[in-house]
A protein has these predicted regions:
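Sec-dependent bacterial lipoprotein signal peptides
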Residues: 1-16
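A residue-level marker of the well-folded mature domains of exported/periplasmic proteins
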Residues: 18-335
Length: 335
């Protein structure tokens, strides 16, 4: 894996030769460059995504520039970064927006015909089309389905009819909302979601929210956090209250600290995403599109539930999935 030292703003350069004459194919008069603008590397999920982008660029001898936002709420800064990248007239853009609309305006300024690959957090397609921005493909987790998987895991951890709380991220964040919606849908007839609390994807805020909820009525028997950083904060609150064996804590993302917490019993489960694979698929989609290949409009990234039963394999395989994953884009890069 690429080291955790910040690569934001650095050009990871490899020789590249990309042919193809289809719509949006890369110019062949010079080395082609792929620009990636992602969320903040203060979250290990996005640092791992960066690693997947960089490693895959190396495997395919691609020329890649990666820029990251200063933090998970740096919407304006991320947009300015992409605006600057757009002036460089890169040949393909990979974007991981902080919200559904903050990158639409700068995307309207990218070179005509340059493919735009949207990874992880979806762009508002209607708003994008309104200003002439065409998204080549979206690659990411089906977050509603992932939330439902988290509910399945919770149903095996708490009694029927148990009281469970959801800890969400930043209000209005599409990913957070989709995960919470999937969890609520999966909870029906199995356990009761009695409260939803926003903690802005922040571990400390989630810890404080969990402390408050643990003191309230009715007694809580489970927490679902829409990301692992918040789940770790909740786990700390549950442990401090002496309820580790009584209150289930499930998260989502499968970051290394969460896998360690599942192994120790501090967390009950996490629905692992694979940001390394999302980065890999994003880079592959750019290469395929630049070669004039037809890339699917939507590519689902893998998700897998990690519990005490399979956490050792999950840790051994990280950042790859627990179980084998079929890469749907690999065939487009052959030959």
């Amino acid at each position: 894996m690429i080291g955790r030292a910040a690569l934001s703003g650095l050009l990871v350069a490899f020789a590249v030769s990309c042919g193809g004459s289809g719509a949006g194919s890369v110019r062949t008069t010079r080395s082609a460059t792929i620009a990636a603008v992602i969320k903040g590397l203060d979250n290990p999920f996005f640092a791992t995504m960066r690693d997947g982008l960089v490693a895959t660029a190396g495997q395919h001898n691609a020329r890649l520039r990666v820029d990251a936002a200063a933090g998970l709420q740096d919407t304006d800064g991320q947009a300015v970064t992409l605006e600057s990248s757009a002036t460089q007239r890169e040949d393909c853009y990979i974007v991981n927006p902080i919200n559904r609309t903050n990158l639409i305006h700068p995307l309207s300024h990218v070179r005509e015909g340059a493919p735009i690959v949207n990874i992880d957090s979806p762009i508002d397609q209607n708003a994008a089309r309104a200003v002439g921005v065409k998204i080549t493909t979206y690659i990411g987790t089906d977050n509603v389905a992932a939330g439902s998987l988290a509910a399945d895991a919770m149903a095996h951890l708490v009694p029927r009819g148990a009281s469970v709380a959801i800890i969400t991220g930043i209000p209005g964040d599409a990913t957070s909302e989709a995960r919470a919606r999937g969890f609520r849908e999966g909870a029906r007839g199995r356990f009761d979601v009695v409260q939803t609390i926003a903690a802005d994807f922040d571990s400390e805020r989630a810890r404080l929210a969990a402390e408050d909820r643990l003191r309230a009525n009715p007694p809580i028997q489970g927490f679902f956090a829409v990301n692992d950083q918040m789940a770790l904060g909740i786990a700390a609150a549950v442990r401090a209250a002496g309820g580790s064996s009584l209150v289930a804590v499930t998260g989502m993302d499968g970051i290394p600290d969460a896998l360690a917490a599942v192994k120790s019993g501090a967390m009950s489960a996490t629905v692992a995403q694979y940001p390394y694979i999302i980065g890999q698929l994003g880079l592959e989609a750019c290469l395929a599109a630049m070669r004039g290949k037809s890339v699917p409009a939507n590519v689902a990234a893998p998700v897998q539930v990690v519990t005490k039963e399979n956490v050792e394999r999950a840790r051994a395989n990280f950042p790859q999935p627990v179980d084998p994953f079929h890469d749907p884009l690999a065939r487009l890069l052959k030959g």
